[in-house]
C-alpha cells in the first residue's frame, strides 16, 4: 500500500514535524487543525468562529485528497474549555449540514489543558474513499 502525503495551501502549514494528512488509498487521516486562517495567519477571537475555521481547514485538506466533507466518518475535537461544548456543537452541526453530510460523523470531544498557539480548539478527521 502506497501512502501519499496531502498538502494544500488552503489550510495552515504544519507547525511541527508532521504533515497535514496522509492518504492511505481508502482512508485519509488529517492531523489536528487549529483555527488559523491560512491566508492571514490570524486566529478568530470567539470559539464559534474558531470551530468554523478549524472545520474549513479540515475540509480544504480532505478536498485536496479528492474527497468532500460528506466523506468524513470520524472526528476528534479537542477543546480547551468544555463550557464551549454547546457553541462548538451548534457550529459543527451547521457545518456538516451545509456540506451535505448524510448524517454526522462519529466523534469524540475531549477537554485538554492547552493547545498550540493557545487556541480554543483543534479538530482532526478521518475520511473514507468509497
Swiss-Prot record:
Organism: Haemophilus influenzae (strain ATCC 51907 / DSM 11121 / KW20 / Rd)
PROSITE patterns cross-referenced by the UniProt entry: UPF0076 (PS01094)
Organism taxonomic ancestry: Bacteria, Pseudomonadati, Pseudomonadota, Gammaproteobacteria, Pasteurellales
GO cellular component: cytosol
Active site: 109
SUPFAM superfamilies linked to this entry: YjgF-like
Assembly and oligomerization: Homotrimer.
InterPro entries: RidA, RidA_CS, RutC-like_sf, YjgF/YER057c/UK114
Annotated NCBIfam families: Rid family detoxifying hydrolase
Entry protein name: RutC family protein HI_0719
Amino acid at each position: 500500500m502506497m501512502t501519499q502525503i496531502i498538502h494544500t495551501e488552503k489550510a495552515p502549514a504544519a507547525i511541527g514535524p508532521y504533515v497535514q494528512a496522509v492518504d492511505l488509498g481508502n482512508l485519509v487521516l488529517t492531523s489536528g487543525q487549529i483555527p488559523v486562517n491560512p491566508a492571514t495567519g490570524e486566529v478568530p477571537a470567539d470559539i464559534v468562529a474558531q470551530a468554523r475555521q478549524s472545520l474549513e481547514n479540515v475540509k480544504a485538506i480532505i478536498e485536496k485528497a479528492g474527497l468532500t466533507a460528506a466523506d468524513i466518518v470520524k472526528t476528534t475535537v479537542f477543546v480547551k474549555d468544555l463550557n464551549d461544548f454547546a457553541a462548538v456543537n451548534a457550529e459543527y452541526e451547521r457545518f456538516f449540514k451545509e456540506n451535505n453530510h448524510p448524517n454526522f460523523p462519529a466523534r469524540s470531544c475531549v477537554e485538554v489543558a492547552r493547545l498550540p498557539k493557545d487556541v480554543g480548539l483543534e479538530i482532526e478527521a478521518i475520511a473514507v474513499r468509497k
